[in-house]
Structures are given as C-alpha cells and as structure tokens.
Amino acid sequence: MSINRESGKYPEKLAGAMENSTYVVSAWDGDKLVGLVRSLSDDETVAFIHYLLVDPEYQKCHIGDGLMSRIMKNFDNLLYVNIMPSEPKTIPFYERYGFKRYDNYSAMVLKKF
C-alpha cells in the first residue's frame, strides 16, 4: 500500500508510530496490507484518528467503512473524536460517521521536516 503523505518517506518512523498508537486496525488480502487506520487516545475524553488509508486498488470495496466501524467501537464513552481529513473529497465519508465541521474549531499543524 502506498502512503501518499510525507510520513511515507520515513518508514522507520511509521513503524514506531504504529507501535505507539493507542489503536491500530488493519485490513488484509492474504498477506497484502490493503487498509489501515490508527488513533491516539487518552481513553477517557478524546481520541484523534490520525489517518485512514486504503490501497487504491481496493477502494470502493467498503474496506474504509469496515476499518472506521471497527476503530469507532473503541470510542463509545469518549467526549470527542477528532479527525483532520487531508483531502476535501473524503469529508462526506467522515460525515457518515457523525463527524461535523465547526466554525469555532480549526486544525493547526507544525511541520518539523
């Protein structure tokens, strides 16, 4: 699966990110990784879904829905679940899971590379 993000240039950091994530859910076709979602959470008030990735060859096969459904089960008792979609075209996908855009919330990023 290709990662169309800057973090894909740092495979050793990605491995560490998986190990240090609160929840990681993956989808496989045999021994091929075809989907992945990971999150960080304090398991009390808030979780951040860092990204949801699906191999382009497997998109439109409901893999993203399966990954979201599985990871969201971990957040039933939290006050907030945050996500920062990297592509505007994915916003309707997240809206199906109850995510909304609010005028008084803005995401900010500090790039250190």
Language-model regions, residue ranges each:
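Conserved active-site alpha-helix within GNAT-family acetyltransferase domains
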Residues: 77, 81-112
